[in-house]
Amino acid sequence: MEALRRITRRPIRRRFLSSQAFDPPPAAPRRRVVVTGLGMVTPLGCGVGETWRRLVDERCGVRALTPADLRMDGFDEATVMHTYDQLTAKVAAIVPCGKGEGKFDEEQWLQSKDHRSTSRFIAYALCSTEEALRDANWLPTEPEKKERTGVSIGGGIGSISDILDAAQLICDKGPNHAAVTACATGAHSIGDATRMIQFGDADVMVAGGTESSIDALSIAGFCRSRALATKYNLLPQVSSRPFDCDRDGFVIGEGSGVMVLEELNHAKERGAKIYAEVRGYGMSGDAYHITQPHIDGKGAILAMTRALEQSGLHPNQVDYINAHATSTPLGDAAEANAIKSVFSDHATSGALALSSTKGATGHLLGAAGSVEAIFSVLAICHGIAPPTLNLLNPDPVFHDGYLPLSTSKKMQIRAALSNSFGFGGTNASLLFACPPT
């Protein structure tokens, strides 16, 4: 130990001495970033239009879990049934598969010659990425444009090496990034991509999150941690109930959400349609407990406050919040307290719309943040705040006009905040606003 102290006290000796230090690096202006393309695969359907329509129509993507859903190919039937019987949670939010409209085509994305070895969560990412790129009308072929296009797509549980499949679809030499921050992965991926554009690393970024963790091992692990809903195994569609007094855990889900982010002038010059502007990105850490947030929501408060400060907007200018609320007893209450702390009188005025869309989609883990960011962008575009399903008996933390939406609400939404808070205390808030004029 004493030897280590002696080493650390030694002065740094440089081989080459300079009489003059370098000038500071050039100060690059922070560029504005907008959303120009959207793509989704969710338990509500495949595609942005189908998912959004079912969400605002108050439909639910949760269903009963079956032994076949455990994906235990190669095991005998007795082992599969024994495993299924041991699970305390028997509901899940599963992507609908098939050939029809709004269905995920497994033959195209998992069984075709090009995708036969593709992991399911990567197939979801590729499907939503293709939709987002076509929506943005950004399919570059020139080397210069491809070099200025990057990818930032993360997964919560899947193999991160497979993210390269999405990168190869999009770019040759642009930034290539994959965040892995539990349930905040999708939000961090979008926020990090925004900063890459702001600092000039790219002009276009394809960003989001993806997840496919409905399998025996993942579900068993969450069951052991007592994180999943177990009271409503016989009533799957009411099992995910954010902010409700009778909530008892989250419903595991799967899917992907991807958006195309673009530097504002770049988007304008090519005549791209602009959904919204990314105004703020706030991050924080709880450092409190591996699965439990601080009851006062200190980490959430910091993330939301930092997003607001970066945006230049006043809390009263935010019209909608898509809450992280997963339907867990502690997490939902902590976030509700945090929102009330940050938005104060605005939260109790009735002017601030608040909902958790996980009542409809379940918890998509690594994809939750990106899917809910897209919901926030669509809320701005369509002037509709989506509902919180199964909110029959609101938690006592809500009072004095402070109450989540239980039905869809048509309203002007100038700015929307999307929260994502992951296990381990990793938090992210994204703030979107109406497109610049």
Report the location of each language-model feature.
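ACP-dependent fatty acid/polyketide chain-elongation machinery
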Residues: E2-D114, N265-E277, I374-L389, A428-T437
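Flexible, low-complexity linker/loop segments at domain and module junctions
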Residues: I7, I12-V35, T141-K146, S311-Q317, ...
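Condensing-enzyme catalytic core mediating Claisen C-C bond formation in acyl metabolism
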Residues: R32-T36, R63, N233-S311, Y320, ...
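Conserved beta-ketoacyl condensing-enzyme motif
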Residues: V35, V56-V180, M196, T210-G221, ...
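Active-site nucleophile and cofactor-binding loops and adjacent substrate-binding regions
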Residues: L55, S117-I122, E144-K146, H177-T185, ...
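Glycine-/small-residue-rich "gating" segment that lines the acyl/pantetheine channel
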Residues: A64, K173-H177, G191, R195, ...
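Active-site-proximal alpha-helical scaffold in enzymes
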Residues: A125-W138, A179-E211, V251-A272, L364-A385, ...
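Acyl-CoA/ACP chain-elongation machinery
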Residues: D201-D248, G282-I295, A325-A333, S349-G401
